[in-house]
Amino acid sequence: MRHYEIVFMVHPDQSEQVPSMIERYTGIVESNGGKVHRLEDWGRRQLAYPINKLIKAHYVLMNVECGKDELDELESLFRFNDAVIRNMVLGRDEAVTEPSPLARSQEKDEEEGGRTAEA
């Protein structure tokens, strides 16, 4: 099995569907012995440029270990799901488990926000 980093963006009007989409995609990966090493829901974020006249999208990052068949199934689900406006799959040499820079900055902001609220 190989390691992959997957980022997909969901239409902002479909944000309530994201948890069920994540559950479905992780189920596909884990169905034949694959693993999800990292899963981050980045939430609704500003796009760098408009896509289909949208300026925001709901981002999800997954680092997975799976076979080619599971990856093909995921890519076809992304392609035929109208709620997914963009997706990117990158091959990785090894599993990535540490938090992404975006997740680290969000954790740092939350910690600083908690400290100022206590003061």
Curated annotation (Swiss-Prot):
One function term, GO molecular function aspect: small ribosomal subunit rRNA binding
Record's keyword terms, sorted: Ribonucleoprotein, Ribosomal protein, RNA-binding, rRNA-binding
Pfam families documented for this protein: Ribosomal_S6
Region spans: Disordered: 96-119
Entries under InterPro entries matching the protein: Ribosomal_bS6 (IPR000529), Ribosomal_bS6_CS (IPR020815), Ribosomal_bS6_sf (IPR035980), Ribosomal_S6_plastid/chlpt (IPR020814), Transl_elong_EF1B/ribsomal_bS6 (IPR014717)
Domain of life: Bacteria
GO BP terms, alphabetized: translation
Residue ranges of coiled coil: none
CDD domains (alphabetical): bS6
GO cellular component: cytosolic small ribosomal subunit
Recorded family membership: Belongs to the bacterial ribosomal protein bS6 family.
Job description of the protein: Binds together with bS18 to 16S ribosomal RNA.
PANTHER family, alphabetized: MITOCHONDRIAL 28S RIBOSOMAL PROTEIN S6 (PTHR21011), SMALL RIBOSOMAL SUBUNIT PROTEIN BS6M (PTHR21011:SF1)
Record-given protein name: Small ribosomal subunit protein bS6
Species of provenance: Alkalilimnicola ehrlichii (strain ATCC BAA-1101 / DSM 17681 / MLHE-1)
